[in-house]
């Protein structure tokens, strides 16, 4: 089992799929990382040699991933809330930010229904 960016990658999966278990790396970026590192994306993670893992580690290290990315996103949201702009207010109230209707939908963002008391 390879460990990259503090994440244990699943050994039985292809490299490009396994890299997606790292927060901040999706399909496109995982394929790009494999290509630049010179690793076949369809190789299973258990079959990687140590130099290949090191090359992947170095390539993933060029991106902001995992805790650093989560922290950056949190800081950006906090900044919006401190500014008091529209998006910040919507974050503060737990409502959708991008103009979706809220009269009937938006249950994911608003959470479970609250009982109406009479």
UniProtKB/Swiss-Prot annotation:
Pfam families: Ribosomal_S13
Gene3D superfamilies membership: 1.10.8.50, 30s ribosomal protein s13, domain 2
PROSITE patterns (alphabetical): RIBOSOMAL_S13_1, RIBOSOMAL_S13_2
Cellular-component GO terms for this entry: cytosol; small ribosomal subunit
InterPro entries (UniProt xref): Rbsml_uS13_C, Ribosomal_uS13, Ribosomal_uS13-like_H2TH, Ribosomal_uS13_bac-type, Ribosomal_uS13_CS
Region (Disordered) location: 94-118
Assembly mode: Part of the 30S ribosomal subunit. Forms a loose heterodimer with protein S19. Forms two bridges to the 50S subunit in the 70S ribosome.
Family, per entry: Belongs to the universal ribosomal protein uS13 family.
Record's function text: Located at the top of the head of the 30S subunit, it contacts several helices of the 16S rRNA. In the 70S ribosome it contacts the 23S rRNA (bridge B1a) and protein L5 of the 50S subunit (bridge B1b), connecting the 2 subunits; these bridges are implicated in subunit movement. Contacts the tRNAs in the A and P-sites.
The protein's name: Small ribosomal subunit protein uS13
Originating species: Stenotrophomonas maltophilia (strain R551-3)
């Amino acid at each position: 089992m390879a460990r990259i960016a503090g994440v244990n990658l699943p050994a039985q999966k292809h490299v490009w799929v396994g890299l997606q278990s790292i927060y901040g790396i999706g399909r496109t970026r995982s394929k790009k990382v494999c290509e630049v590192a010179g690793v076949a994306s369809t190789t299973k993670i258990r079959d990687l040699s140590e130099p290949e893992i090191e090359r992947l580690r170095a390539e993933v290290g060029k991106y902001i991933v995992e805790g650093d990315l989560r922290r950056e996103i949190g800081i950006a949201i906090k900044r919006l809330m401190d500014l008091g702009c529209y998006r910040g207010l919507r974050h503060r109230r737990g409502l959708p930010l991008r103009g979706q209707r809220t009269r009937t939908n938006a249950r994911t963002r608003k959470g479970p229904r609250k009982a109406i008391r009479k």
